């Protein structure tokens, strides 16, 4: 029996191994191989340094760590770095609310979270740590901005922003609540136009869409989300001339030029430049009132499908491009200024949204497309016909169908000079300006004589000034940093001013994976050699909430940098795993809608509100402080150890599914690790050592054959689970449990060589999952070096060969028993064995079956 000194005690052994690994430099990135296939880049999406890890973080980073550890065991040279997405609004808010410096607040949080991550036993190369708020990082973010500027992919233009009329400052979208009010002053936010910086992501829209086909290692839903966001549409632009002068025109884009003869109105975005010109005197007041009513409504709400569409007539008209007839012009909330041309043609008979709008405002509905061979109904239709069909009421184009009709009308529009074929995208250029302090400064200078002048690369970084007043009003806090703002123009030397906007934090996170490849380089953001060695990232892990923006912007950066010969890859991430959320049990009073903390629930089986006795609703939701359903990772590590936390996170659910936290299952994983401890403790007591592999006996006993089969079945299954197209950590842990059960009580019944192979294999398979325990047991059993310096076990195919197999016996499709038969049995022989079995005789009652269905090696089904 094991002594008390040999009890499994993770609280003592885990810190020991974390220190040992650090001293050994075990997690340091080795020099990459010249062969890219020999290198492996494992990466988690880096976190915002809030100061506290949550279980979602743990799941993300443990998944990546298992992959990194596996690849090291398989002989790969692994890059597994970590850093901090450290700019952003929370630090600025903390500075205002608590009177602390954002840099100090952020650095304290980073130190705290780094320690929390290290307690999880993650094999991270901390020598490559980056923080986007440190000038040695954002120097290169600024350098990259200048690359975009030099390539004419960065520009300034007027854009609509949220404006706080009390604080006299611009608000980010996240600073405006659901009612359209400022988060600070409570004032109703207004819309204003300001000159803003943009990156021209639309310049590579085709590549971003087409190259999604290359990303076979990405979840299909993520690729679909990106494709929909990019939203490529083929159609035509058509010009509706303004009757007043005949020179100006409203240009609309449509995917259905075949419906142009059904146009009964044109709709402009309320912000369109031509609205004032087209608005008649008697409609001006109504138009202005409508515009004002949109000030507090977000663009998302304006275009939401479930929201009634509102509009108002301008009183102006335009000329139909084919008939010359006057078409009334309206403005409506569902047309956005920055989408397409900011104008659409209304064809209510053939567009559901236009149909609803026309019905609401009593506008004409004219059918011009019908099912082939069908005459149009008399009177107005009861609903829009949105499919392709045969043209009617379309002058010379009557009788044309579908794509042929579209092509003919586009050609006619081009010949008349009133339109052209066009491809458009839903994707809009990326607005990167932020009127905030805690962000990367935009490295340009404004000169009255020279205009916008890039900061010379030799002057980078443009560092954020310290001791800036963050609580005042009147635009960006950097506007008030007078000494910092006032500079000399790099071109002419005259007085000039710095750009006071900072960059969207996505700018910093769109290239950090490149910096990790050469993180300590003081003279370049990265090098061709470092990119060629490590990029693209082999396995990227992060939440699906980043499916569009972060992942799309990262792809954009990579494509632009490839075009400028700065990187060799066209895509940043080869494989992507989007892990599910971690959910906690949640208690809520159905009457008051108040959430109740689990500690206040006296009986979890029949939970009631301690205040009013109301029976509580019980369900699982994403962990959050407001719902009292969070679990502190530190507390779990304190009680059970990091290895148990890791095992639970990996075992509880497939990685892409949501995981429901269960304390009982955590306890179950702790007991499983204790069983492995006892198993190896018993092997140690019997004198087993792992120092050098012993030769297997020439002849194996049945017990040895069975144990070796269990060992190599586990090696094959775990290897497949960790390297297949779909990573299945949960089933891999199940295989470890099966193997440990097969080994229990059998090590004493087999030769030392077979026992050694079994224990060695079990610990190597366990190592990526429970790295501390695996290394401790490896050391206790005299293994050489660290277990994480060994090689992943290979499957011995001969060990999997069975002399007999188990075949399922069914009668009328229902399982009635099993047959143990020779593995080499023929189909006819298997049928005869089945018919002669006691099970068959019992269920057939001595009668011959009408049919016998034999699936060799699998089953026999007798049909009476």
UniProtKB/Swiss-Prot annotation:
Gene3D superfamilies linked to this entry: HUPs, Isoleucyl-tRNA Synthetase, Domain 1, Valyl/Leucyl/Isoleucyl-tRNA synthetase, editing domain
Keyword ATP-binding listed: yes
Keyword set, alphabetical order: Aminoacyl-tRNA synthetase, ATP-binding, Cytoplasm, Ligase, Nucleotide-binding, Protein biosynthesis
Cross-referenced PROSITE patterns: AA_TRNA_LIGASE_I
Sites where the protein binds ATP: 625
Placement of sequence motif 'KMSKS' region: 622-626
Reactions that this protein is recorded to catalyse: tRNA(Leu) + L-leucine + ATP = L-leucyl-tRNA(Leu) + AMP + diphosphate
Residue ranges with Basic and acidic residues bias: 299-309
Region (Disordered): 298-317
Main EC class the enzyme belongs to: ligase
Enzyme Commission code: 6.1.1.4
Motif ('HIGH' region): 47-57
GO cellular component: cytosol
GO MF annotation terms: aminoacyl-tRNA deacylase activity; ATP binding; leucine-tRNA ligase activity
GO BP: leucyl-tRNA aminoacylation
Localization of this protein: Cytoplasm
Highest taxon of the lineage: Bacteria
Classification via InterPro entries: aa-tRNA-synth_I_CS, aa-tRNA-synth_Ia, Leu-tRNA-ligase, Leu_tRNA-synth_edit, M/V/L/I-tRNA-synth_anticd-bd, Methionyl/Leucyl_tRNA_Synth, Rossmann-like_a/b/a_fold, tRNAsynth_Ia_anticodon-bd
Entry's family note: Belongs to the class-I aminoacyl-tRNA synthetase family.
Classification via PANTHER family: LEUCINE--TRNA LIGASE, MITOCHONDRIAL, LEUCYL-TRNA SYNTHETASE
Protein name: Leucine--tRNA ligase
Originating organism: Synechococcus sp. (strain RCC307)
Protein's gene: leuS
């Amino acid at each position: 029996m094991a002594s008390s000194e040999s009890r499994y005690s993770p609280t003592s052994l885990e810190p020991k191994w974390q220190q040992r690994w650090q001293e050994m430099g075990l997690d340091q990135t080795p020099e990459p191989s010249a062969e890219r296939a020999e290198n492996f880049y494992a990466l988690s999406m880096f976190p915002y340094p809030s100061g506290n890890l949550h279980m979602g973080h743990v799941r993300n980073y443990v998944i990546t760590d298992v992959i990194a550890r596996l690849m090291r065991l398989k002989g790969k040279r692994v890059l597994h770095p970590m850093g901090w997405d450290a700019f952003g609004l929370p630090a600025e808010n903390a500075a205002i609310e608590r009177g602390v410096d954002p840099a100090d607040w952020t650095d304290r949080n980073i130190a705290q979270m780094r320690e929390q991550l290290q307690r999880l036993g993650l094999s991270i190369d901390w020598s490559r740590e980056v923080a986007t708020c440190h000038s040695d990082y954002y120097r290169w973010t600024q350098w990259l901005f200048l690359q975009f500027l030099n390539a004419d992919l960065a520009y300034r233009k007027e854009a609509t922003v949220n404006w706080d009329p009390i604080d006299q400052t611009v608000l980010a979208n996240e600073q405006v609540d659901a009612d359209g009010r400022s988060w600070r002053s409570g004032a109703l936010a207004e819309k204003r136009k300001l000159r803003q910086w943009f990156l021209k992501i639309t310049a590579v829209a085709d590549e971003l869409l087409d190259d999604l086909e290359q990303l076979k290692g990405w979840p299909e839903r993520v690729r679909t989300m990106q494709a929909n966001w990019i939203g490529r549409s083929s159609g035509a632009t058509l010009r509706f001339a303004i009757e007043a002068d005949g020179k100006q025109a409203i240009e609309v884009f449509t995917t259905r030029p075949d419906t142009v003869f059904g146009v009964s109105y044109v709709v402009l975005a309320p912000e369109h430049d031509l609205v004032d010109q087209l608005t008649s005197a008697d409609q001006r007041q109504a138009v202005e009132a409508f515009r004002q009513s949109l000030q507090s409504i977000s663009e998302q709400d304006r275009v939401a499908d479930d929201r009634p569409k509102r509009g108002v007539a301008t009183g102006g008209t335009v000329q139909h491009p084919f008939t010359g007839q006057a078409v009334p012009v309206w403005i409506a909330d569902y047309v956005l200024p920055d989408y397409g041309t900011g104008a659409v043609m209304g064809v209510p008979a053939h567009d559901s949204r236009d149909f609803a709008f026309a019905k609401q405002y009593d506008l004409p509905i004219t059918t011009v497309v019908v099912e082939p061979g069908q005459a149009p109904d008399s009177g107005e239709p009861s609903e829009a016909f949105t499919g392709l069909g045969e043209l009617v009421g379309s002058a010379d184009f009557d009788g044309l169908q579908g794509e042929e009709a579209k092509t003919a009308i586009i050609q006619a529009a081009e010949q008349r000079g009133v339109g052209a074929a066009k491809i458009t995208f839903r994707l809009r250029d990326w607005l990167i300006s932020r009127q905030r302090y805690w962000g990367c400064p935009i490295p340009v200078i404004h000169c009255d004589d020279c205009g916008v002048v890039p900061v010379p690369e030799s002057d980078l970084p443009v560092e954020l000034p310290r001791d800036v007043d963050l609580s005042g009003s009147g635009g960006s806090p950097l506007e008030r940093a007078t000494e910092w703002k006032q500079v000399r123009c790099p071109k002419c030397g005259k007085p000039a001013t710095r750009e006071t906007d900072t960059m969207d934090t996505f700018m910093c996170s769109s290239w950090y994976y490149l910096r990790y490849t050469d993180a300590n380089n003081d003279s370049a953001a990265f090098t061709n050699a470092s990119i060629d060695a490590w990029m693209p990232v082999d396995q990227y892990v992060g939440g699906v909430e980043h499916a569009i923006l972060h992942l799309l912007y990262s792809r954009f950066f990579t494509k632009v940098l490839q075009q400028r010969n700065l990187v060799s890859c066209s895509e940043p991430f080869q494989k992507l795993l989007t892990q599910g959320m971690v959910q906690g049990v949640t208690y809520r009073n159905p009457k008051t809608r108040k959430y109740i903390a689990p500690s206040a629930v006296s009986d979890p089986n029949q939970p009631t509100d301690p205040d009013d006795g109301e029976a509580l609703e019980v369900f699982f939701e994403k962990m959050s402080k407001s719902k009292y359903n969070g679990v502190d990772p530190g507390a779990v590590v304190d009680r059970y150890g990091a290895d148990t936390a890791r095992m639970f996170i990996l075992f509880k659910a497939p990685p892409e599914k949501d995981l429901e936290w269960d304390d009982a299952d955590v306890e179950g994983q702790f007991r499983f690790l204790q069983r492995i401890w006892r198993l190896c403790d018993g092997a140690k007591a019997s004198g087993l050592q792992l120092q050098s592999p012993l030769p297997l006996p020439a002849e194996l006993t049945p017990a040895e054959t069975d144990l070796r089969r269990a060992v190599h079945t586990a090696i094959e299954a775990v290897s497949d689970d960790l390297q297949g197209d779909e990573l299945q950590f949960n089933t891999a842990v199940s295989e470890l449990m099966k193997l440990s059960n097969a080994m229990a009580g059998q090590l004493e019944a087999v030769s030392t060589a077979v026992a050694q192979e079994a224990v060695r294999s079990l610990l190597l398979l366990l190592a990526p999952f429970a790295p501390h325990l695996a290394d401790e047991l490896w050391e206790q059993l005299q293994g050489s070096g660290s277990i994480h310096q060994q090689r992943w076990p290979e499957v011995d195919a001969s060990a999997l060969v069975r002399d007999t197999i188990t075949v399922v016996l069914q009668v009328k499709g229902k399982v009635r028993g099993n047959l143990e038969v020779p593995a080499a049995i023929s189909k006819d022989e298997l049928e005869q064995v089945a018919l002669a079995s006691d099970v068959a005789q019992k269920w057939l009652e001595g009668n011959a079956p009408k049919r016998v269905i034999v699936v060799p090696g699998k089953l026999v089904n007798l049909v009476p």
